[in-house]
Amino acid sequence: MSEYYWDHQIEYLRNTRWLYYNDDYLEFLVQRVWKIHKPVKIIEYGCGFGYMGLKLLPILPEGSTYTGIDKGVDLINHANEIFAQLPYDSEFIVSDIEDTPFEKKYDIAISHAFLLHMTDPERILKKMIDSVKGNGMVICFEPHWIANMSNNYLDGIEQSDIIRLGILQELFEQDRKRTGKDGNIGIQIPILLSQLGLRNVGCRVSDKVNFLDQNMDARGKGLLYRALKEEGLGQEPDDRAEVMNDLLSRGLSETEAKEQYEAEAAFSKQFTDESWLVYAPNMKISFGTVELKLNVSRQRT
């Protein structure tokens, strides 16, 4: 059995990714923002089971190709099973991205909810840039956790009783200092891309707003409720003592840890399949163009 964590999270990935984007918005980005009008070769870093390939290939110009890289053997096997039934030119490679160089032959390098798990995201961005040809693009779909947490509304209660934004921000910052991993990396990517030499850097935000509507059809409501719970909204916290000890070890004071536990417990108790809830994931979508570098002899001709 694989020891790689994400090999055991395939169902979670399949059940929650659809919460983030409407298909027409991705089509708008491809056609109107990035202006992709001819076939492109895409490489995705940390591709999982190829979700972004599944979303982008149908709306990219015919003849586009997709290469997915991930160190999860089970994830890559699952991706191969899915894409074997589809008409797209795709390739999946099992590889540890942090240690493997890739040839500079792609038009676009992308990541989706990947850089937040890296202890040195800037190093990975450099590798992404190095795999893209001149005038190609780097596109990063990455989370901004504090914006995510402030973009859900549970009807009938005070939001500050279930979402302690100040404590969460402190917790996220302490985690970054301790591990190097940053769930707020999405808001920082435009700065990093520009500092690394990309031009025409821009950033958009994911469009989808999920509405748990008590007047919607029962099947759709059940599907959405289960996805929201699996995404982490209103999940029941573990044993109080264990949670408190974990929060204390991550840098919170005893008072802050107590408030955070009580907020999570309250959210879990209040959020049911009979709740009215609105949730916008608020993913940041950052992009920039790789500089075209001509050799000296070419410039002189």
Which residues fall in each region the model found?
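Class I SAM-dependent methyltransferase Rossmann-like catalytic core
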Residues: 1-24
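Conserved alpha-helix/loop element of class I SAM-dependent methyltransferases that forms part
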Residues: 20-40, 55
